Amino acid sequence: MRINQRDIVNVEFIFPDGKAKNHYAIVVSNNELIESEGFVYLVLITSKDYNSNYYYELSNDMVLNFSFSKQSYVKCHILMTTMENIVSFPLGQIKKQYFDKIVNKIIYSIF
């Protein structure tokens, strides 16, 4: 397994309308699922700040070994599933305490 939960990766993110664009994303699936099935759940990171009810604002102090060049937001209502071998190697990692808050915001946003 080359990626883990909380990793920041770069991936061709496929949106609900079928369009695709390279974006940063956070691996949200747990390591057991990645290992056993070979696929990952990802949540979108973008510099767009619309739909504030559904985003989690990021800052560089929330991240290990990586810096965003622009203000960035996790779009907690936009997730994607893809195969592990499709995503880039980890670029950095979200610190655990912030990842837990992001997961809670995903749950709030979707359920």
Question: Model-flagged regions — what are they?
Answer:
Residues I14-G18:
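Short, charged beta-turn/beta-strand-edge "cap" motif at the junction between a beta-strand
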Residues K19-M62:
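Compact nucleic-acid interaction/catalytic patches
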